[in-house]
């Protein structure tokens, strides 16, 4: 060893050492805590009168019958021998080394004799003594205190492999006796090189958490980190820093005896809690030291002493330095175990209402904080999930910590029904924390700090805890996971595989969803960190997603998406306006300018853009009815023309897919009229058409007469299709004029795509402005017109209109109130139109909406087997008060293994297929006829409770085809008597119905 230490470029460093008698505890603490380096006190046993007590003769005389637990260890086979007593091991050591068999048995982890413990406590300084007041373990209840005072008896060649002491504890090792020329070599890696040491031992086939490999000194010489070495002899007292990898080998011809113990100090506790515990939990090693309980009981002890102490008799600043880290750790513990359910939306919850927390159950028994997680063996401080069905060896149920449950780990048989349990009321602990903060605040004030400075210290401390625990605490995530475990699987945006919802995070910007596998394996992000955040911008929004949809959208991102200003489009302003406010995609009754956003649709079209940057950037859009090519020519021509030969609604359906408009001249004289007046019921049928994709409205409007250049930006898709709507109103005349009257006067607007300019004066204004229609314009026009604010146009209808004036519902809000989404608005528009137009047709087939393979499975099924269904309706479910669904009349469209109910034969219930991201088995629902709503019966409260995904799929259906609307009178008279047969297992669909039928 001496040669290795002196070798050129050697990474071996002799440990710092000083005499025991002249070295203060502060120096030792500075080395092992602040520097993370080992330290040695020499001559510790010098002058001890009873040094002869630490001999094999003493052990043979007093403790010969003492049973050795898992000792001695055979260093050759790496196994612990069983059934040995002290006299057996001493007899083995008295045999000459050449004759010993096995060759190397190491007496490790032997319980320390009581006499030795008492003598050491008497002789050593309190800062070093086992379970003294400086050892925080002593503050725990007796039943929680671990016994770490152990004896090690070794001969030449025995060793302890490289390892880390558990939970970041401080290791102290004193050689109390040895034969002549017997010693031990220590190899200790500084704390700061912990990760490098873990990798180094791992590369050599070792595991420092399981003491599996001793690396030869010659091999350690080439390690990429410094190694502190020391030759330990009797009286040498070695202090090992927390989280330090170290190994020991006994050398020399004789036998050496060492006494070792571990402790937790005030300065090492933060290292234990924040650094060591996560590693210990990942390795599933039992927490020998209950660090969380240590922090709690130590803080209670100190706070109690402070309350009963006169501040003038103590050094307040020293007490503050002691309390501050303890208070932060205890606050962090309580915050981690707090279940705090925020309002949606956030990355781990996409608009869904998480149910309120039920009261916790209490653990029975007098002992508290004595339970461990049955998966990772980590300490359970106060709260956990508990399976009452599965029993452990002690007859108790299984416990699972919040860290495991938040990762989807729990009882494999009863995960969904695990219950929450606690030892102490969480609210009681929070009150205790508040009282501790008050004491801490008084100490700060007594130290001479100003009130503002005191408040800043408290605020920074609490904010730091909130940041460490995340927007969603670990307990909150675990609560979400258990709740999500009983729900349907959700498809990942990128890989399109289905996962349980607890393995999915949602983009708070575009609602795209990504699974944990894609987040971790493809994009290299920490899923556990992302799901605790309050917002997250996904890889689609950042342009990093490599899925086919995002790639195709990226290829088309060179096309301009949005033209926001009337001057850009060559459209005249409303001359009756004196306001400077411009409104995009909105119909306004306050005399504001109306600007039109035009979206370029890239679905099933070829877009060729020729851009000529001359004087004015006006838009010429030449659309030819003989093909689907959309040619956008940007010239300096002030007049924009539309050449079209479309003369039917079907032609307009194709036209609506091209979504690029300027100012249009219509060369077809067969135009449609609609007299739309609040005082009559003369309404034509209304057709809702929808574009294939939505683009972000990010381009700002230009003002005045200046020209503007539109910068191509990347489109962002939204699941379920686009928000751009176009409606065409047809009536009895041959002019394309829509007459709207707010004050019993007619305002005639010439429309090409049903975009309405409303004026609140009594003059008749004719605006021949060709405009585009968007979802918001249609929805707002419906809500601001008499159809939604006054009595519906169908005088026989008594249904309450859905109000959207302020984009928020009126009246008493539901518990899960959230903002209206574009999909909600689309469905509301359909319902209002259905009510106001005497149940008119709401849609027609649109061949250019989406390829059929991109449609939801239920929409595809409806298109392929339309005759098997009775129409669209709404139904109540256990998980949601309102879900859109399709009434199934022909049971051959459901899986043949679906178990049916007798109430279907009796005519009390019907079979429906629900919209939503569900597995095929979960599509099928059996609902009571009293639990359904016809299409136009829903109200705003129920509609808000419906999720975005099922509504988006319903939106796809209406944009793809003209679906039937289920009528209650038809449902009331219907039953499945002729389609069901009885088998031994129950009722099922007759097998003959599946002949020549497509099964889901």
From Swiss-Prot:
Renumbered zinc finger spans (PHD-type): 489-544
Protein name: C-module-binding factor A
Domain comment in the entry: The C-terminal domain (724-998) alone is able to regulate gene expression. The C-terminal domain (724-998) is required and sufficient to maintain high steady-state levels of both sense and antisense RNA transcripts of the tRNA gene-associated retrotransposon TRE5-A.
Keywords assigned by UniProt, alphabetized: Chromatin regulator, Coiled coil, DNA-binding, Endocytosis, Metal-binding, Nucleus, Phagocytosis, Transcription, Transcription regulation, Transposition, Zinc, Zinc-finger
Annotated Low complexity bias: 574-647, 660-683, 700-710, 732-751, 760-789
DNA-binding region: 810-818
SUPFAM superfamilies: Clavaminate synthase-like (SSF51197)
Zn finger residue spans: RING-type: 492-542
SMART domains attached to this UniProt entry: JmjC
Limits of the JmjC domain: 113-280
């Amino acid at each position: 060893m001496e040669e290795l230490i002196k070798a050129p470029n050697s990474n071996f460093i002799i440990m710092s050492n000083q005499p025991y008698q002249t070295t203060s505890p502060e120096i030792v603490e500075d080395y092992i805590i602040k520097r993370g380096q080992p330290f040695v006190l020499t001559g510790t046993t010098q002058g001890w009168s009873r040094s002869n007590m630490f001999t094999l003769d003493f052990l043979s005389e007093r403790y010969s019958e003492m049973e050795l637990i898992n000792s001695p260890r055979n260093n050759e086979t790496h196994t612990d021998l069983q059934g040995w007593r002290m006299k057996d091991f001493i007899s083995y050591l008295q045999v000459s080394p050449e004759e010993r068999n096995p060759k190397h048995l190491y007496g490790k982890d032997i319980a320390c004799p009581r006499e030795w413990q008492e003598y050491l406590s008497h002789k050593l300084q309190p800062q070093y003594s086992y379970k003294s007041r400086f050892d925080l373990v002593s503050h725990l209840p007796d039943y929680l205190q671990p016994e770490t005072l152990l004896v090690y008896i070794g001969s030449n060649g025995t060793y302890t492999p490289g390892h880390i002491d558990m939970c970041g504890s401080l290791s102290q090792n004193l050689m109390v006796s040895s034969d002549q020329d017997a010693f031990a070599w220590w190899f200790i890696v500084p704390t700061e090189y912990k990760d490098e040491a873990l990798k180094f031992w791992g590369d050599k086939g070792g595991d420092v958490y399981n003491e599996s490999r001793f690396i030869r000194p010659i091999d350690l010489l080439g390690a990429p980190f410094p190694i502190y070495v020391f030759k330990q002899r009797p009286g040498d007292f070695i202090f090992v820093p927390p989280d330090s990898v170290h190994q020991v080998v006994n050398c020399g011809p004789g036998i050496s005896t060492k006494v070792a113990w571990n402790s937790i100090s005030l300065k090492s506790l933060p290292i234990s809690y924040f650094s060591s515990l996560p590693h210990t939990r990942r390795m599933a090693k039992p927490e020998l030291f209950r660090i969380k309980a240590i922090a709690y009981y130590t803080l209670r002890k100190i706070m109690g002493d402070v309350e009963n102490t006169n501040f003038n008799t103590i050094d307040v600043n020293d007490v503050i330095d002691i309390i501050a880290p303890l208070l932060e750790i205890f606050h962090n513990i309580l915050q981690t175990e707090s279940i705090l359910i925020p309002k949606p939306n956030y990355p781990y919850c996409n608009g869904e209402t998480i149910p309120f927390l039920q009261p916790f159950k209490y653990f029975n028994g007098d002992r508290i904080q004595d339970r461990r997680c049955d998966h990772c063996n980590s300490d359970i401080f106060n709260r956990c999930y508990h399976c009452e069905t599965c029993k452990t060896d002690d007859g108790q149920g299984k416990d699972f910590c919040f860290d495991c449950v938040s990762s989807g780990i729990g009882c494999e048989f009863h995960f969904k029904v695990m219950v929450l349990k606690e030892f102490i009321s969480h609210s009681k602990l929070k009150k205790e924390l508040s009282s501790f903060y008050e004491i801490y605040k008084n100490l700060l004030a007594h130290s001479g700090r100003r009130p503002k400075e005191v408040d800043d210290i408290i605020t920074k401390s609490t904010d730091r805890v909130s940041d460490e625990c995340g927007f969603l605490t670990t307990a909150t995530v675990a609560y979400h996971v258990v709740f999500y475990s009983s729900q349907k699987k959700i498809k990942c945006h990128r890989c399109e595989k289905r996962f349980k919802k607890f393995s999915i995070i949602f983009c708070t910007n575009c609602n795209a969803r990504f699974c944990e596998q894609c987040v971790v394996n493809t994009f290299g992000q920490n899923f556990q960190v992302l799901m605790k955040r309050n917002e997250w911008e996904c890889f689609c929004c950042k342009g990093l997603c490599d899925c086919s949809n995002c790639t195709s959208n990226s290829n088309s991102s060179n096309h301009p998406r949005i033209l926001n200003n009337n001057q850009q489009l060559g459209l005249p302003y409303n001359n009756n306006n004196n306001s400077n406010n411009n409104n995009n995609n909105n119909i306004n009754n306050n005399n504001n300018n109306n600007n039109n956003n035009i979206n370029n649709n890239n679905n099933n079209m070829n877009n060729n853009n020729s851009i000529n940057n001359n004087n004015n950037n006006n838009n010429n859009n030449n659309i030819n009815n003989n093909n689907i090519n959309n040619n956008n020519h940007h010239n300096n021509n002030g007049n924009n023309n539309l050449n079209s030969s479309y003369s039917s609604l079907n032609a307009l359906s194709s036209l609506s897919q091209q979504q690029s408009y300027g100012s249009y001249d219509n060369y077809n004289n067969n135009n449609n009229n609609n007299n739309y007046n609040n005082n009559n019921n003369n309404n034509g049928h209304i057709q809702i058409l929808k574009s294939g994709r939505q683009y972000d409205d990010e381009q700002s409007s230009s003002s005045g007469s200046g020209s503007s250049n539109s910068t191509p930006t990347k489109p962002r898709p939204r699941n379920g299709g686009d928000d751009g709507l176009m409606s065409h109103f047809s009536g009895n005349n041959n002019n394309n004029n829509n007459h709207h009257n707010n004050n019993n006067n007619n305002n005639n607007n010439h429309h090409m795509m049903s975009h309405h300019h409303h004026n609140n004066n009594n003059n008749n204004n004719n605006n021949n402005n060709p405009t585009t229609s968007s979802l918001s314009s249609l929805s707002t026009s419906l809500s601001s017109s008499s159809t939604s604010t006054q009595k519906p146009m169908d005088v026989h209808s008594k249904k309450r209109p859905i109000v959207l004036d302020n984009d928020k519902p009126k009246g008493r809000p539901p518990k899960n109130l959230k903002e209206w989404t574009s999909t909600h608005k689309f469905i509301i528009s359909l319902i209002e139109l259905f009510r106001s137009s005497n149940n008119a047709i709401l849609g027609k087939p649109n061949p250019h909406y989406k390829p059929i393979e991109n449609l939801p499975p239920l929409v595809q099924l409806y298109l392929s087997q339309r005759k098997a269904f009775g129409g669209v309706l709404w139904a109540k479910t256990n998980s949601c008060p309102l879900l859109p669904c399709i009434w199934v009349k022909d049971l051959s469209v459901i899986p043949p293994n679906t178990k049916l109910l007798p109430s279907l034969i009796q005519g009390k219930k019907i079979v429906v297929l629900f919209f939503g991201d569900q597995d095929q088995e979960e599509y099928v629902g059996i609902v009571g006829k009293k639990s359904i709503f016809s299409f136009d019966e829903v109200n705003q409260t129920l509609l808000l409770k419906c999720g975005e995904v099922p509504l988006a799929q319903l939106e796809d259906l209406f944009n793809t085809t003209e679906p039937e609307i289920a009528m209650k009178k038809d449902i009331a008279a219907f039953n499945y008597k002729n389609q069901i047969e009885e088998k031994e297992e129950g009722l099922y669909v007759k097998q003959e119905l599946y002949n020549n039928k497509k099964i889901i």
